[in-house]
């Protein structure tokens, strides 16, 4: 099986309660908020440059690793699957990957190779981390590596075609052109 390697820029270290977010306009990682509840990120979390997901931000990725990485660090990541998710009415895919330069993860090549409990931790986190904000997150399913590759390519194409639009304009345009990706 061919490896699907991508550089992922870390926004949020594993175990953090701080929600950092990349700002494409300024090319900086900013503090977005402190999580409202007692949750913390179960794995490192970041974005993939030159991609645009349906929520108007770069495509997101959880990186399974034993270490917590600093915001802004680029981690070579082997993508193994994805979570298909709807966040506050917008499709917001989360790719799932493992650090590629750690031999402890060399045997993990698909989402089925990950410990189920670790995937369930991420699902549980995503279902609950916005409850106190009164926002709904729906996990539609755990998806395969092939599905993740296709979603990645869609997000690369969206960035090429619409990446210069402000986020609000992009979402408004996509809601008209592709209402199937929005539940508002």
Swiss-Prot record:
Keywords noted in UniProt: Cytoplasm, Hydrolase, Magnesium, Metal-binding
Chief localization: cytoplasm
Residues the record lists as binding Mg(2+) 2: 60
Cellular compartment(s): Cytoplasm
Binding site for Mg(2+) 1: 55, 60, 92
Xref: Pfam families: Pyrophosphatase
EC supergroup of this enzyme: hydrolase
Catalytic activity: diphosphate + H2O = 2 phosphate + H(+)
GO BP terms, alphabetized: phosphate-containing compound metabolic process
GO MF annotation terms: inorganic diphosphate phosphatase activity; magnesium ion binding
GO cellular component, one term: cytoplasm
Cofactor(s) listed: Mg(2+)
Entry function: Catalyzes the hydrolysis of inorganic pyrophosphate (PPi) forming two phosphate ions.
NCBIfam families found in the cross-reference section: PRK02230.1 (NF002578)
Quaternary structure note: Homohexamer.
Family stated for the protein in its record: Belongs to the PPase family.
Protein's name in the database: Inorganic pyrophosphatase
Taxonomic source organism: Mycoplasma pneumoniae (strain ATCC 29342 / M129 / Subtype 1)
Encoding gene (name): ppa
């Amino acid at each position: 099986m061919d490896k699907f390697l991508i550089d992922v820029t870390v926004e949020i270290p594993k175990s953090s309660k701080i929600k950092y977010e990349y700002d494409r306009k300024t090319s900086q990682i900013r503090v977005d908020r402190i999580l409202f509840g007692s949750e913390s990120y179960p794995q490192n979390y970041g974005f993939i440059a030159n991609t645009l997901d349906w929520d108007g931000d770069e495509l997101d990725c959880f990186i399974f690793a034993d270490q917590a990485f600093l915001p802004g660090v680029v981690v070579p990541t082997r993508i193994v699957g994805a979570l298909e998710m709807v966040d506050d009415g917008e499709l917001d895919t989360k790719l799932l990957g493992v650090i590629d330069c750690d031999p402890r993860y060399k045997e993990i090549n698909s989402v089925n190779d990950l410990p189920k409990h670790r995937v369930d931790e991420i699902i549980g986190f995503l279902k609950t981390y916005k409850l106190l904000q009164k926002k709904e997150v729906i996990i539609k399913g755990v998806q395969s590596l092939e599905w993740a590759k296709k979603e990645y390519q869609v997000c690369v194409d969206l960035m090429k075609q619409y990446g210069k639009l402000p986020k609000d304009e992009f979402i408004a345009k996509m809601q008209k052109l592709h209402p199937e990706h929005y539940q508002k």
